[in-house]
Amino acid sequence: MLEDLKRQVLEANLALPKHNLVTLTWGNVSAVDRERGVLVIKPSGVDYSVMTADDMVVVSLESGEVVEGHKKPSSDTPTHRLLYQAFPTIGGIVHTHSRHATIWAQAGQPIPATGTTHADYFYGTIPCTRKMTEAEINGEYEWETGNVIVETFEKQGIDAAQMPGVLVHSHGPFAWGKNAEDAVHNAIVLEEVAYMGIFCRQLAPQLPDMQQSLLDKHYLRKHGAKAYYGQ
Protein backbone atom coordinates (compact mmCIF):
# COMPACT_ATOMS: atom_id res chain seq x y z
CA MET A 1 0.00 0.00 0.00
CA LEU A 2 1.25 3.49 -0.92
CA GLU A 3 4.71 2.26 -1.91
CA ASP A 4 5.53 5.42 -3.87
CA LEU A 5 4.50 7.67 -0.99
CA LYS A 6 6.54 5.57 1.44
CA ARG A 7 9.62 6.02 -0.74
CA GLN A 8 9.00 9.76 -0.95
CA VAL A 9 8.68 10.01 2.82
CA LEU A 10 11.81 7.91 3.31
CA GLU A 11 13.83 10.15 0.97
CA ALA A 12 12.50 13.25 2.68
CA ASN A 13 13.48 11.90 6.10
CA LEU A 14 16.96 10.97 4.85
CA ALA A 15 17.39 14.55 3.63
CA LEU A 16 17.17 15.86 7.21
CA PRO A 17 20.62 14.65 8.40
CA LYS A 18 22.07 15.42 4.97
CA HIS A 19 21.17 19.08 5.47
CA ASN A 20 22.14 19.13 9.16
CA LEU A 21 18.57 19.63 10.33
CA VAL A 22 18.60 16.80 12.87
CA THR A 23 20.83 15.29 15.53
CA LEU A 24 20.41 11.59 16.36
CA THR A 25 16.72 10.80 15.61
CA TRP A 26 15.34 14.25 16.52
CA GLY A 27 13.03 14.85 13.59
CA ASN A 28 10.34 13.45 11.36
CA VAL A 29 8.70 13.94 7.98
CA SER A 30 5.26 12.85 6.86
CA ALA A 31 3.11 13.08 3.74
CA VAL A 32 -0.64 12.75 3.35
CA ASP A 33 -2.86 10.93 0.87
CA ARG A 34 -6.12 12.80 1.30
CA GLU A 35 -8.10 10.55 -1.05
CA ARG A 36 -7.30 7.51 1.08
CA GLY A 37 -7.51 9.46 4.33
CA VAL A 38 -4.07 8.37 5.54
CA LEU A 39 -0.64 9.80 6.20
CA VAL A 40 2.76 8.13 5.95
CA ILE A 41 5.29 9.01 8.64
CA LYS A 42 8.71 8.03 9.95
CA PRO A 43 8.79 5.36 12.65
CA SER A 44 9.71 6.32 16.19
CA GLY A 45 13.32 6.06 17.31
CA VAL A 46 14.77 4.44 14.18
CA ASP A 47 18.22 5.65 13.15
CA TYR A 48 18.34 7.32 9.75
CA SER A 49 21.29 5.18 8.68
CA VAL A 50 19.24 1.97 8.75
CA MET A 51 15.79 3.27 7.85
CA THR A 52 14.00 1.77 4.84
CA ALA A 53 10.77 2.45 2.97
CA ASP A 54 9.25 -0.62 4.63
CA ASP A 55 9.78 1.05 8.01
CA MET A 56 7.43 3.92 7.13
CA VAL A 57 4.12 3.75 8.99
CA VAL A 58 0.69 4.37 7.45
CA VAL A 59 -1.72 6.05 9.87
CA SER A 60 -5.39 6.96 9.60
CA LEU A 61 -5.75 10.72 9.31
CA GLU A 62 -9.03 10.65 11.23
CA SER A 63 -8.46 8.12 14.01
CA GLY A 64 -4.68 7.96 14.33
CA GLU A 65 -4.77 4.17 14.17
CA VAL A 66 -1.95 2.37 12.38
CA VAL A 67 -3.27 1.10 9.04
CA GLU A 68 -0.05 -0.51 7.89
CA GLY A 69 3.44 -0.94 9.29
CA HIS A 70 5.43 -3.05 11.71
CA LYS A 71 6.88 -0.21 13.77
CA LYS A 72 5.48 2.46 16.05
CA PRO A 73 4.83 5.78 14.30
CA SER A 74 6.64 8.93 15.40
CA SER A 75 5.43 10.30 18.72
CA ASP A 76 4.67 13.56 16.89
CA THR A 77 2.07 11.86 14.67
CA PRO A 78 -0.91 13.52 16.44
CA THR A 79 0.55 16.95 15.69
CA HIS A 80 0.93 16.03 12.02
CA ARG A 81 -2.64 14.70 11.91
CA LEU A 82 -4.11 17.86 13.38
CA LEU A 83 -2.17 20.13 11.02
CA TYR A 84 -3.32 18.14 7.97
CA GLN A 85 -6.90 18.42 9.20
CA ALA A 86 -6.63 22.17 9.88
CA PHE A 87 -4.60 23.17 6.81
CA PRO A 88 -6.12 21.40 3.78
CA THR A 89 -3.63 22.81 1.25
CA ILE A 90 -0.56 21.13 2.72
CA GLY A 91 0.72 17.73 1.63
CA GLY A 92 3.87 17.22 3.69
CA ILE A 93 5.08 18.19 7.17
CA VAL A 94 8.54 18.33 8.77
CA HIS A 95 9.42 18.68 12.44
CA THR A 96 13.03 19.15 13.52
CA HIS A 97 15.10 20.57 16.33
CA SER A 98 17.40 22.36 13.89
CA ARG A 99 19.78 24.46 15.94
CA HIS A 100 19.08 28.07 15.04
CA ALA A 101 15.33 27.78 14.54
CA THR A 102 15.14 26.03 17.90
CA ILE A 103 17.08 28.88 19.52
CA TRP A 104 14.34 31.27 18.40
CA ALA A 105 11.66 28.85 19.62
CA GLN A 106 13.31 28.44 23.02
CA ALA A 107 13.54 32.22 23.31
CA GLY A 108 9.84 32.43 22.45
CA GLN A 109 10.61 34.84 19.62
CA PRO A 110 9.13 35.04 16.11
CA ILE A 111 11.59 35.45 13.24
CA PRO A 112 11.11 38.86 11.60
CA ALA A 113 11.26 39.29 7.84
CA THR A 114 14.36 41.42 7.30
CA GLY A 115 15.56 40.29 3.88
CA THR A 116 14.68 38.80 0.55
CA THR A 117 15.84 35.25 1.36
CA HIS A 118 13.10 35.17 3.98
CA ALA A 119 10.58 36.88 1.69
CA ASP A 120 11.08 34.37 -1.11
CA TYR A 121 9.49 31.68 1.07
CA PHE A 122 7.67 33.19 4.06
CA TYR A 123 5.17 36.01 3.58
CA GLY A 124 5.98 37.92 6.74
CA THR A 125 7.23 37.21 10.24
CA ILE A 126 7.51 33.51 11.04
CA PRO A 127 5.29 33.18 14.13
CA CYS A 128 6.07 31.61 17.47
CA THR A 129 3.25 30.10 19.47
CA ARG A 130 2.41 30.97 23.04
CA LYS A 131 3.61 28.75 25.86
CA MET A 132 1.46 25.68 26.33
CA THR A 133 -0.63 25.49 29.48
CA GLU A 134 -0.14 22.91 32.19
CA ALA A 135 -3.37 21.22 31.12
CA GLU A 136 -2.17 21.03 27.50
CA ILE A 137 1.21 19.65 28.53
CA ASN A 138 -0.26 17.05 30.87
CA GLY A 139 -3.12 16.10 28.55
CA GLU A 140 -2.92 15.04 24.91
CA TYR A 141 0.40 16.84 24.53
CA GLU A 142 1.21 16.15 20.88
CA TRP A 143 -2.37 16.84 19.77
CA GLU A 144 -2.38 20.07 21.78
CA THR A 145 0.90 21.06 20.15
CA GLY A 146 -0.98 21.05 16.86
CA ASN A 147 -3.83 23.00 18.42
CA VAL A 148 -1.54 25.76 19.66
CA ILE A 149 -0.07 26.10 16.15
CA VAL A 150 -3.53 26.38 14.59
CA GLU A 151 -4.60 28.84 17.28
CA THR A 152 -1.59 31.04 16.48
CA PHE A 153 -2.43 31.13 12.78
CA GLU A 154 -6.11 31.83 13.42
CA LYS A 155 -5.50 34.60 15.96
CA GLN A 156 -2.89 36.30 13.79
CA GLY A 157 -4.84 35.85 10.57
CA ILE A 158 -2.03 33.92 8.91
CA ASP A 159 -2.57 31.77 5.81
CA ALA A 160 -0.70 28.48 6.16
CA ALA A 161 -0.24 28.40 2.39
CA GLN A 162 1.72 31.67 2.58
CA MET A 163 3.54 30.88 5.81
CA PRO A 164 4.90 27.31 5.54
CA GLY A 165 6.47 27.23 8.97
CA VAL A 166 6.07 28.01 12.65
CA LEU A 167 8.03 27.89 15.90
CA VAL A 168 6.48 26.14 18.88
CA HIS A 169 7.43 28.00 22.05
CA SER A 170 10.19 26.26 24.04
CA HIS A 171 10.17 23.38 21.55
CA GLY A 172 11.19 23.83 17.92
CA PRO A 173 10.14 24.38 14.30
CA PHE A 174 7.51 22.75 12.13
CA ALA A 175 7.46 23.35 8.37
CA TRP A 176 5.20 22.13 5.59
CA GLY A 177 4.69 22.22 1.85
CA LYS A 178 2.81 20.74 -1.08
CA ASN A 179 4.54 17.38 -0.50
CA ALA A 180 7.25 15.87 1.69
CA GLU A 181 10.12 17.12 -0.47
CA ASP A 182 8.72 20.65 -0.54
CA ALA A 183 8.26 20.59 3.23
CA VAL A 184 11.92 19.67 3.70
CA HIS A 185 12.91 22.48 1.33
CA ASN A 186 10.98 24.95 3.47
CA ALA A 187 12.51 23.53 6.66
CA ILE A 188 15.98 24.09 5.20
CA VAL A 189 15.14 27.71 4.39
CA LEU A 190 13.56 28.21 7.82
CA GLU A 191 16.78 27.10 9.50
CA GLU A 192 18.83 29.36 7.22
CA VAL A 193 16.77 32.48 7.87
CA ALA A 194 16.83 31.69 11.60
CA TYR A 195 20.63 31.64 11.43
CA MET A 196 20.71 34.92 9.49
CA GLY A 197 18.23 36.49 11.87
CA ILE A 198 20.35 35.84 14.95
CA PHE A 199 23.34 37.65 13.45
CA CYS A 200 21.21 40.47 12.05
CA ARG A 201 19.88 41.09 15.55
CA GLN A 202 23.41 41.10 16.98
CA LEU A 203 24.69 43.54 14.36
CA ALA A 204 21.64 45.80 14.46
CA PRO A 205 19.48 45.22 17.57
CA GLN A 206 16.91 47.78 16.42
CA LEU A 207 16.76 46.54 12.84
CA PRO A 208 13.25 47.12 11.46
CA ASP A 209 11.36 44.67 9.30
CA MET A 210 12.04 44.90 5.59
CA GLN A 211 9.94 47.21 3.43
CA GLN A 212 6.46 45.82 2.81
CA SER A 213 6.82 46.59 -0.89
CA LEU A 214 10.01 44.51 -1.08
CA LEU A 215 8.42 41.67 0.88
CA ASP A 216 5.45 41.74 -1.50
CA LYS A 217 7.69 41.81 -4.57
CA HIS A 218 9.82 38.85 -3.56
CA TYR A 219 7.04 36.66 -2.25
CA LEU A 220 4.50 37.36 -4.96
CA ARG A 221 6.90 37.05 -7.89
CA LYS A 222 7.43 33.43 -6.78
CA HIS A 223 4.03 32.55 -5.35
CA GLY A 224 1.49 35.10 -6.54
CA ALA A 225 -1.09 34.83 -9.32
CA LYS A 226 1.40 36.34 -11.77
CA ALA A 227 4.48 34.51 -10.47
CA TYR A 228 7.39 34.58 -12.86
CA TYR A 229 10.59 34.12 -10.86
CA GLY A 230 12.89 31.11 -10.76
CA GLN A 231 16.64 30.67 -10.31
UniProtKB/Swiss-Prot annotation:
GO terms for biological process: L-arabinose catabolic process to xylulose 5-phosphate; pentose catabolic process. The keyword Nucleus does not apply. One of its GO terms (molecular function) is L-ribulose-phosphate 4-epimerase activity. It is an enzyme of class 5 (isomerase). Its cofactor is Zn(2+). GO terms for cellular component: cytosol. Substrate binds at residues 27-28, 44-45, 74-75. InterPro entries: Aldolase_class_II_sugar_metab (IPR050197), Aldolase_II/adducin_N (IPR001303), Aldolase_II/adducin_N_sf (IPR036409), AraD (IPR004661), AraD_entero (IPR033748). Pathway: Carbohydrate degradation; L-arabinose degradation via L-ribulose; D-xylulose 5-phosphate from L-arabinose (bacterial route): step 3/3. This is L-ribulose-5-phosphate 4-epimerase. The gene is araD.
